UniProtKB/Swiss-Prot annotation:
Any one GO biological process: aspartyl-tRNA aminoacylation
Role: Aspartyl-tRNA synthetase with relaxed tRNA specificity since it is able to aspartylate not only its cognate tRNA(Asp) but also tRNA(Asn). Reaction proceeds in two steps: L-aspartate is first activated by ATP to form Asp-AMP and then transferred to the acceptor end of tRNA(Asp/Asn).
Gene3D superfamilies assigned to the protein according to its UniProt record, in alphabetical order: Bira Bifunctional Protein, Domain 2, GAD-like domain, Nucleic acid-binding proteins
Residues flagged as site, Important for tRNA non-discrimination: H33
Protein name in UniProt: Aspartate--tRNA(Asp/Asn) ligase
Organism for this UniProt entry: Rickettsia canadensis (strain McKiel)
Gene: aspS
Amino acid sequence: MHKYRTHNCNALQISDVGKEVKLSGWVHRRRDHGNLVFIDLRDHYGITQIVFTDQNLQLMEMASRLRYESVITVIGKVVARSGDTINDTLTTGHIEILAREFIVESAADTLPFVINTEKDAPEDLRLKHRFLDLRREKLHNNIILRSQIISHIRHLMTARGFTEFQTPILTASSPEGARDFLVPSRMHSGKFYALPQAPQQFKQLLMVSGFDRYFQIAPCFRDEDARADRSPGEFYQLDVEMSFVTQEDVFSTIEPVMYDLFTKFTDKKVSETPFIRIPYNESMLKYGSDKPDLRNPIIIADVTEIFRDSDFTIFRENIKKGSVVRAIPAPKAAAHARSFFDKMIEFAISEGAGGLGYIQFSKNDKAKGPVAKFLSPQQLESLKATVNISDGDAVFFVSDKKEKAAKLAGKVRIRISDELDLLEKDCFKFCWITDFPFYELNEETAKIDFSHNPFSMPQGGLDALKNAKTTAELLELTAYQYDIVCNGIELSSGAIRNHKPEIMYKAFSIAGYSEEEVNKRFGSMIRAFKFGAPPHGGIAPGIDRIVMLLAEATNIREIIAFPLNQQAEDLLMNAPNYVEDKALKELGIMLLPSARKNVEQE
């Protein structure tokens, strides 16, 4: 017999009755019934009930003193449970083990929180004792699911002719849009490596190197604030790059991977391929977001022209000053109480709106509400047709500059859906957002900057860049840039790359970078592109967000084994931490007085 176990805790069935077995695991629960002690023994695979009887009083008394989460090895006979004690929620629920001996492999101290319940302890306490937290069923299963998803991704990608690579972790800083994690060099004093925000340049260089289809389960490091769906330190992505491809080639390659993943690991309805394509400007108009949740049936409409010559002075004057008016329908909400409309107005104001107009179209064909009296019957009919609403519906209005109005309308759209419970249940709805702006105005400097990935190919190529003379014309330029969105969550960004040095120099010069600076920051890639670079493109779906959706987790830390907390601290390993002065001296680093003060205080 094996030293620790003949079976795992999820293996024994009614067909095993009469066998002598050995099991090892953690004491999950203990119940003392006087003449009987029951222990639920748990391992990675499941739970088996162990029973100690008063026929071996000493053994039973020892079992009654076992602390939860102690590790034990038990030897005993498999017996059938009586009919009224069968537990159909357990795979092993038809049997139990009548113990004849056990060994304590490792006794547990008093637990800082309860393991055998789904009730959450404070998160920082859980993260400090993550090795205990990971024993809980839901979290344990999430980590197993993550492994299965990544394994299946590898299978899907290799089956499609992709080669898996590992790119460097110590590299140079590049402008990916977030702060770098910097690593000082001991051998090159005063110089720093950066942990990669993404393997962007390396995967493009692999295409230049003649490889055709690259993928990597890539760790990425960004020094940015935490969110519910974003870890503050590192995350993983399915990094993909392909040579000699168009945008549609990328779509048709990734769509079946996403569809296969989501249909394999969930019973929910998944969007059929091909996924719907929505240009960026259309998405901002109809949904008020470049990450639309298509489970929400509400579609925003532009009603600027209806109000341009209306008697509603506020909107009419706004339009004269360059603002727009967006209408957000509220299906079957016309008969709702005044409190519903007041609550919506309060919400809009809390989001920065000056107010929120509305009209109720009652079933007797009467329009009421604060805005209705300012519109003629013809304008009201035009409004109903434009917004696609009918009697019994209500409609809300926001008016502001185009970009702000879009975002406000998008937030109102989501809030209406929540209030009216409109969100379609038990489904994953995918879409592509395409034709992103190539440039944007930097909010701090008011200068032209890249909107997304600076390595994207502008639509129209070099001619488009040369022909755009004004700021307005530059902001109208679009890129071969795309996002894949599922249920309102951006899973990935991607692009067809700019593989021509002359276009890259021009694109960067418009954003304020000299040719010398481009060569300094991206010299390796520019140099490579001068020796024959294939047209190429790629994408990088976020592994963590995919697992979050499939695990139905609301917090990204619930699908990562050892995450940082929201303050970017590893409470288990006590990181970040201070290092000795000797190590700093070797690296040529001296702490500022404010940083030195923090060291001394701790």
